[in-house]
């Protein structure tokens, strides 16, 4: 299959969360919202039951990978889990009995992309505690995908999480760690490696010839010359200097409290921030329903909706599919970009 003809591989996510219902909703809106063809990897009977319970007139078809695009016009294509495992879940009641199916769906999606049967991976939300209860060894989705991407006997690539929207794109340098651990983890090497990956993928995947990056400070006022913490002066500033010496357009460290207003956003393409919440709070404020999680540094395209499992509203029929639809559309654009040479990035000011 040509790249433009291949479907996206959508994972099951946690079946007790909103993933299954937003997948059904995305399929229903395929014409109205320009949703590209995708196949969901899971249990067809479970998806049928979910549609029935929610009162959604969504036909579900069990498919082989080669059939997904043709079927997508008339039914939601569901590729059974390779093991044939069945899924049973109660909305809002996460169950570690489904951990195996959740992990198998992710692994199968990566296998489809690596074999050429799918163009990109789009992941539905998972709950880490459901998986860690049964011995899952990875901090989250992103790190597990990096492990799957590693070639036999080689170190996994450094995965970089970018949250993308039409208004703002951000990268947290440290991800799912306690805030008190950040100063020890925030090394000059980590900042430089992260920025290099962002720069390289913005050029290769997003089509930006000269990406403009900024780096937020860690401390108030970016440390104010060391009077409010030394990390900005001793770690972040040397990293920026080293990156600029390599020809990467990056500024910082800059005070975080003035980095995300409209005029500031017009001066850069991506903002890197030392901590998870420094990066995610502004994008979720600006684009809560439209943000997309994009993993950079992998040998394949992976996107995800920028929200969690939402167990509190699962099964109530109120979950919005907007972020999933944005993730599906961006994944297709990134997978096709080398062929159509159209950048998925917002028009720069």
UniProtKB/Swiss-Prot annotation:
It comes from the Bacteria. InterPro entries: PdxA, PdxA_fam. It is an enzyme of class 1 (oxidoreductase). It catalyses: 4-(phosphooxy)-L-threonine + NAD(+) = 3-amino-2-oxopropyl phosphate + CO2 + NADH. Keywords: Cobalt, Cytoplasm, Magnesium, Metal-binding, NAD, NADP, Oxidoreductase, Pyridoxine biosynthesis, Zinc. Homodimer. This is 4-hydroxythreonine-4-phosphate dehydrogenase. It comes from Methylorubrum populi (strain ATCC BAA-705 / NCIMB 13946 / BJ001).
